[in-house]
């Protein structure tokens, strides 16, 4: 069995019955639907289970804890979108803090970031998200937006 992955995004959609007299289907259409699907798909690349756009996290009135995993230019999009990962109530606050420090440092000081990520890995194990950001910084890419090539 596979693992369920969830992507969350907010906005207006067109929803209703679509199709002809012989076959109708209730569905939602629009950019928000496509962006949500891309966010859900991003889970697989990052090794996460639940991701949400910054817009959704900001508008949700929930006790759910979230951590930023960075900005991503989703396939078919021109701009980067900040994405957040859902974390459990039992998440280690020290791990969360070091993760955020590593993420921020990857885009400001690659030499310091390498040491910080190494420290993170020794304490908590390998992390796909940090590895992705660090690789981009090492390649010398100026942007803090990771450009995704596949859905």
Mark where each language-model region is.
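Short acidic, glycine/proline-rich loop/turn micro-motifs
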Residues: 17-22
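Amphipathic alpha-helical transducer elements in NTP-driven molecular machines
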Residues: 29-36
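Generic signature of intrinsically disordered, low-complexity, basic-rich segments
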Residues: 11, 23-24, 33
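Cytosolic regulatory/linker segments at or just downstream of nucleotide-handling modules
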Residues: 13-15, 36, 43-151
């Amino acid at each position: 069995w596979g693992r369920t992955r969830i992507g969350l995004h907010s906005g207006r959609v067109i929803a209703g019955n679509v199709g002809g007299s012989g076959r109708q289907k209730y569905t939602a259409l629009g950019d928000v639907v496509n962006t949500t699907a891309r966010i859900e798909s991003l889970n697989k690349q990052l090794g996460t289970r639940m991701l949400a756009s910054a817009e959704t996290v900001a508008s949700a009135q929930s006790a759910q804890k979230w951590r930023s995993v960075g900005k991503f230019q989703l396939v078919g999009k021109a701009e980067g979108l900040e994405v957040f990962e859902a974390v459990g109530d039992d998440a280690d606050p020290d791990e969360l803090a070091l993760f955020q420090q590593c993420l921020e440092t990857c885009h400001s000081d690659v030499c310091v970031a390498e040491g910080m990520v190494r420290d993170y890995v020794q304490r908590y194990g390998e992390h796909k998200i940090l590895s992705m950001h660090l690789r981009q910084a090492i390649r010398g890419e100026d942007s803090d937006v990771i450009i995704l090539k596949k859905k």
